[in-house]
A protein has these predicted regions:
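Cap/insert and terminal regions of metallo-dependent hydrolase folds
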Residues: 175-256
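Binuclear metal-dependent hydrolase catalytic cores
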Residues: 1-170, 236-255
């Protein structure tokens, strides 16, 4: 089955431009250097599946003309991946069923606490997002496609990436556990965290991510969760031909 993947956001948790920064990338005229918080949309068989609801989701949805949403998967509960949940409201109002949200138990509980007014039946506000939380305890089958959770390490925490068809999305990665590599064979497309060149305690560097690419051997790799240390055009010129920086608005066709 054919699918389309759209990069809604390719940036780090602070986004690019970063508030208060006067660096060349933050003031770059190249639109590829404008990076909202990290998220992707996968469309297939008339369905739309979102990975993470960033604080920039409203802007991302308007930019890409998103008209409907059928499910949301969460990688983990950090602010740059969940704070846009309330902005799914307009997409939830004209559906016969609530939009299902899928998260690890710890992240589902965090969502319930942070968005209590949505999930607590004692709150009687009108106009709430019509969503329903489900916990991830294994593969998630959505509209005929299996989304396989891939455990990755993010600093001291274990979080999720996802394998779907011949593609995988691994954002916020400092290392990949040995047991997860078996889920990454035969990929056409890999999205992989590559924050910058300088080491970081919770994110992979460009150099480390290139080592991962050499082991996994996907046909194409797109780095994501990119900070303002990496100018788009200049960085791409240093990468192997099958590896590129992703960018907001990038669209790819693939087999799911």
């Amino acid at each position: 089955m054919k699918a389309r993947l759209t990069v809604l956001g390719s940036g780090t948790s602070m986004g690019v431009p970063t508030i208060g920064c006067d660096c060349a990338v933050c003031h770059s005229p190249d639109p590829h250097d404008r990076r909202t918080r990290p998220s992707i949309l996968i469309e297939y068989a008339g369905k739309s599946v979102l990975i993470d609801t960033t604080p920039d989701f409203r802007e991302q949805a308007i930019r890409e003309g998103i008209r409907h949403l059928d499910a949301v998967l969460y990688t983990h509960g950090h602010a740059d991946h969940i704070l846009g949940l309330d902005d799914v409201r307009p997409l939830s109002f004209h559906r016969p069923e609530k939009i299902p949200l899928y998260a690890r138990p710890v992240d589902a509980e965090l969502l319930r606490r942070m968005f209590r007014y949505i999930f607590d039946a004692d709150y009687k506000f009108g106009g709430l997002a019509q969503v329903e939380l489900h916990t991830i305890d294994g593969p998630v089958d959505l509209f005929g496609v299996r989304f396989e959770p891939v455990k990755v390490i993010h600093g001291d925490a274990e979080i999720l990436g996802f394998r779907f068809g011949q593609a995988a999305y691994l954002t916020d990665v400092s290392e990949i556990p040995e047991e997860s590599y078996s889920l990454l064979t035969g990929l056409d497309i890999l999205f992989l965290d590559a924050l910058r060149h300088k080491p970081h305690p919770t994110h992979s560097t460009v150099e480390n991510s290139l080592r991962i690419v050499e082991r996994v051997k996907p046909k194409r790799t797109f780095f994501t969760h990119i900070c303002h240390d990496l100018p788009h055009e200049a960085t791409n010129a240093t990468l192997p031909p099958q590896v590129r920086l992703s960018y907001d608005g990038l669209k790819l066709e693939f087999e799911i």
